[in-house]
Amino acid sequence: MRETKNGPVVDGEGWFVVNAQDSRWREMGPLGAYCNFEGKRRFPQLGININVLGPGERIGMYHRENAQEGFLVLAGECTLVIEDQERQLTAWDFVHCPPGTPHIIVAAEGQSAVVLAVGGRGRGVGGGVRYLVSDVAARHGASVGEETTDPSAAYADVYAALPRSTWAPYRDGSLPSL
C-alpha cells in the first residue's frame, strides 16, 4: 500500500484492508465519482467500485461486457436501462448481468445514489466491452453515437470536459451511514 495526496493506493499483491472513506476517489463529471480500491496494478480477476452519482449522473455509457457484472444500490434511486428496457431501482435492489447483457445505471433526477458495482474481468479488445447505440439510454445521456469497442471514443465528450487529474480524496457525506 502506498500513500498519495488523495488517499492510500494498493500497488502490490496480497491481502489488504482499506476504508472507502480513506481511499482515493476518481471524479468523473457526469459519471459521478467512484472508488475502485486499485492502483496501477488492477485486480486480475474481479473489479469492484463504489459509485456515488449525483442526480441524473450515470455509471458509464450503455454497454455490454463478456464477463458478468453485479450491481447493488446502497442508497438513493436509479434507473436501470437493460436490454433497451427501463427498470426503477431503489436501495438494496440487486442487478445481475450475465455476460453480453446490455445495461447502464443512471441516478434518478433530483436524487443522488450510491451503487456498488462488481464484475469479472473481461477478455478481448477493451476488456471485452462493447458500447452500444440505444434510444432508451440516449434519453438519459448514456448512449454512444456509434457502436464501438474503444473507450476513448465512447467517453470522448466526458474526458474532454474533465480536468487533467481527476483523482481526489473522499468527499465527506458521499457515502451513507448504514
Name each model-derived stretch.
Residues 28-36, 49-65, 99:
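Conserved short histidine dyad/triad with adjacent acidic residue
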Residues 59, 82-87, 129:
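Short beta-strand segments
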Residues 79, 99-126:
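Ligand-binding loop in jelly-roll beta-barrel domains
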Residues 122-141:
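Conserved, surface-exposed functional patches that form binding/active-site neighborhoods
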